[in-house]
Amino acid sequence: MRTKPTVWLIVGVLAGVLGGTAGAVQAGVRINLSPSMPKGLYRLVQCDETAGRDAGVGDWVVIDTTEASSNPSVAFFRTQGWLSYSGRSDDLLMKTIVGVGGDEVTEKVGRLYVNGTPFTKNASRRQRTVGTLPLPSVELPQRINEGEVWLSSDHEKGIDSRYFGAVARSSIACKVEAAWTL
Protein backbone atom coordinates (compact mmCIF):
# COMPACT_ATOMS: atom_id res chain seq x y z
CA MET A 1 0.00 0.00 0.00
CA ARG A 2 1.30 3.44 -0.91
CA THR A 3 1.82 6.01 1.73
CA LYS A 4 0.03 9.35 1.55
CA PRO A 5 3.19 11.30 0.64
CA THR A 6 3.75 8.99 -2.38
CA VAL A 7 0.17 9.46 -3.58
CA TRP A 8 0.45 13.24 -3.20
CA LEU A 9 3.76 13.20 -5.08
CA ILE A 10 2.13 11.35 -7.99
CA VAL A 11 -0.84 13.73 -7.96
CA GLY A 12 1.53 16.72 -7.88
CA VAL A 13 3.60 15.45 -10.81
CA LEU A 14 0.47 14.75 -12.88
CA ALA A 15 -0.94 18.19 -12.08
CA GLY A 16 2.37 19.80 -13.08
CA VAL A 17 2.48 17.94 -16.39
CA LEU A 18 -1.14 18.77 -17.22
CA GLY A 19 -0.74 22.40 -16.16
CA GLY A 20 2.49 22.76 -18.12
CA THR A 21 0.88 21.26 -21.22
CA ALA A 22 -2.12 23.58 -20.96
CA GLY A 23 0.21 26.56 -20.49
CA ALA A 24 2.29 25.57 -23.51
CA VAL A 25 -0.81 25.31 -25.70
CA GLN A 26 -1.98 28.74 -24.51
CA ALA A 27 1.48 30.15 -25.28
CA GLY A 28 1.26 28.89 -28.87
CA VAL A 29 3.51 25.85 -28.48
CA ARG A 30 2.50 22.67 -30.29
CA ILE A 31 3.88 19.16 -30.15
CA ASN A 32 4.30 17.35 -33.46
CA LEU A 33 4.48 13.57 -33.27
CA SER A 34 3.56 12.94 -36.89
CA PRO A 35 6.24 12.00 -39.43
CA SER A 36 5.08 14.85 -41.71
CA MET A 37 7.49 17.27 -40.02
CA PRO A 38 10.43 16.70 -37.67
CA LYS A 39 9.07 15.47 -34.34
CA GLY A 40 9.31 18.04 -31.57
CA LEU A 41 7.99 21.30 -30.15
CA TYR A 42 6.94 24.18 -32.39
CA ARG A 43 6.06 27.79 -31.64
CA LEU A 44 3.15 29.34 -33.53
CA VAL A 45 4.16 32.85 -34.60
CA GLN A 46 2.46 35.55 -36.62
CA CYS A 47 -1.02 34.11 -36.09
CA ASP A 48 -2.97 36.89 -37.75
CA GLU A 49 -4.29 37.92 -41.15
CA THR A 50 -0.74 38.77 -42.32
CA ALA A 51 0.59 35.20 -41.87
CA GLY A 52 -0.53 34.04 -45.30
CA ARG A 53 0.54 37.21 -47.03
CA ASP A 54 4.05 37.19 -45.52
CA ALA A 55 4.78 33.44 -45.77
CA GLY A 56 7.26 32.36 -48.44
CA VAL A 57 9.18 29.39 -49.78
CA GLY A 58 10.90 27.50 -46.98
CA ASP A 59 8.54 28.73 -44.26
CA TRP A 60 6.74 26.25 -42.04
CA VAL A 61 3.07 27.11 -41.75
CA VAL A 62 -0.12 25.71 -40.29
CA ILE A 63 -3.15 25.54 -42.51
CA ASP A 64 -6.65 25.86 -41.12
CA THR A 65 -8.22 22.82 -42.80
CA THR A 66 -11.71 24.19 -42.16
CA GLU A 67 -10.75 27.28 -44.18
CA ALA A 68 -9.17 25.15 -46.92
CA SER A 69 -12.01 22.61 -47.04
CA SER A 70 -13.61 24.31 -50.05
CA ASN A 71 -10.89 22.34 -51.87
CA PRO A 72 -12.64 18.95 -52.50
CA SER A 73 -9.47 16.94 -51.79
CA VAL A 74 -8.85 18.72 -48.46
CA ALA A 75 -12.49 18.01 -47.57
CA PHE A 76 -11.94 14.33 -48.47
CA PHE A 77 -8.90 14.02 -46.19
CA ARG A 78 -10.72 15.86 -43.37
CA THR A 79 -13.66 13.44 -43.52
CA GLN A 80 -11.23 10.50 -43.36
CA GLY A 81 -9.63 12.04 -40.24
CA TRP A 82 -6.20 11.90 -41.92
CA LEU A 83 -5.11 15.50 -41.56
CA SER A 84 -3.83 15.28 -38.01
CA TYR A 85 -1.81 12.89 -35.88
CA SER A 86 -4.54 12.88 -33.23
CA GLY A 87 -7.23 11.91 -35.73
CA ARG A 88 -9.18 15.11 -35.04
CA SER A 89 -10.08 16.59 -38.39
CA ASP A 90 -10.28 20.09 -36.91
CA ASP A 91 -6.56 20.21 -36.12
CA LEU A 92 -4.25 22.54 -37.95
CA LEU A 93 -2.12 20.99 -40.68
CA MET A 94 1.62 21.82 -40.47
CA LYS A 95 3.65 21.79 -43.71
CA THR A 96 6.51 23.54 -45.55
CA ILE A 97 5.86 26.00 -48.38
CA VAL A 98 7.82 24.89 -51.46
CA GLY A 99 6.06 26.95 -54.13
CA VAL A 100 4.19 30.25 -54.46
CA GLY A 101 2.09 32.02 -57.08
CA GLY A 102 3.70 31.89 -60.52
CA ASP A 103 5.84 28.82 -59.76
CA GLU A 104 5.40 25.65 -61.82
CA VAL A 105 5.22 22.18 -60.25
CA THR A 106 6.17 19.25 -62.49
CA GLU A 107 6.82 15.54 -62.10
CA LYS A 108 9.55 13.62 -63.92
CA VAL A 109 10.28 9.95 -63.35
CA GLY A 110 8.56 10.00 -59.98
CA ARG A 111 10.34 13.13 -58.72
CA LEU A 112 8.55 16.39 -58.07
CA TYR A 113 10.07 19.71 -59.13
CA VAL A 114 9.29 23.38 -58.56
CA ASN A 115 10.59 25.57 -61.39
CA GLY A 116 12.92 22.74 -62.45
CA THR A 117 14.43 22.22 -58.98
CA PRO A 118 13.63 18.92 -57.18
CA PHE A 119 11.93 19.08 -53.80
CA THR A 120 14.66 18.68 -51.23
CA LYS A 121 12.59 16.86 -48.62
CA ASN A 122 10.00 14.84 -50.49
CA ALA A 123 10.88 13.69 -53.96
CA SER A 124 8.94 10.44 -53.92
CA ARG A 125 6.10 9.51 -56.19
CA ARG A 126 2.55 10.03 -55.02
CA GLN A 127 0.61 7.07 -53.65
CA ARG A 128 -2.49 6.23 -55.65
CA THR A 129 -4.40 4.31 -52.96
CA VAL A 130 -4.54 3.55 -49.25
CA GLY A 131 -5.60 -0.08 -49.21
CA THR A 132 -8.38 -0.14 -51.78
CA LEU A 133 -9.40 3.50 -51.23
CA PRO A 134 -8.32 5.67 -54.19
CA LEU A 135 -6.64 8.93 -53.22
CA PRO A 136 -7.25 12.28 -54.89
CA SER A 137 -4.43 13.40 -57.13
CA VAL A 138 -3.34 16.58 -58.85
CA GLU A 139 -2.67 16.82 -62.55
CA LEU A 140 0.86 17.98 -63.24
CA PRO A 141 2.42 20.14 -64.53
CA GLN A 142 0.58 22.85 -62.63
CA ARG A 143 1.26 26.57 -62.43
CA ILE A 144 0.48 27.89 -58.93
CA ASN A 145 -2.02 30.76 -59.03
CA GLU A 146 -1.26 34.09 -57.38
CA GLY A 147 -2.60 34.01 -53.82
CA GLU A 148 -1.84 30.29 -53.44
CA VAL A 149 1.01 28.16 -52.06
CA TRP A 150 2.21 24.60 -52.67
CA LEU A 151 2.86 22.61 -49.49
CA SER A 152 5.21 19.69 -48.91
CA SER A 153 5.60 17.14 -46.16
CA ASP A 154 8.93 15.85 -44.87
CA HIS A 155 7.55 12.30 -45.04
CA GLU A 156 7.21 10.48 -48.35
CA LYS A 157 3.69 9.36 -47.44
CA GLY A 158 2.63 12.69 -45.96
CA ILE A 159 -0.59 14.30 -47.12
CA ASP A 160 0.34 17.50 -48.92
CA SER A 161 -0.19 19.42 -52.15
CA ARG A 162 0.70 16.34 -54.20
CA TYR A 163 -2.83 15.20 -53.31
CA PHE A 164 -4.82 18.39 -52.84
CA GLY A 165 -2.95 20.90 -54.99
CA ALA A 166 -2.15 24.48 -54.08
CA VAL A 167 -4.05 26.08 -51.19
CA ALA A 168 -5.13 29.67 -50.72
CA ARG A 169 -2.82 31.88 -48.68
CA SER A 170 -5.93 32.90 -46.72
CA SER A 171 -6.03 29.38 -45.21
CA ILE A 172 -2.60 29.91 -43.57
CA ALA A 173 -3.38 30.35 -39.88
CA CYS A 174 0.16 30.89 -38.56
CA LYS A 175 3.81 30.70 -39.42
CA VAL A 176 5.69 28.14 -37.32
CA GLU A 177 9.18 28.04 -35.80
CA ALA A 178 10.88 24.98 -34.36
CA ALA A 179 11.44 25.32 -30.63
CA TRP A 180 13.02 21.88 -30.18
CA THR A 181 13.10 18.95 -32.59
CA LEU A 182 14.53 15.46 -32.54
What are these language model-derived features?
Residues M1-L182:
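Extended hydrophobic leader/signal-anchor segments used for secretion and membrane insertion
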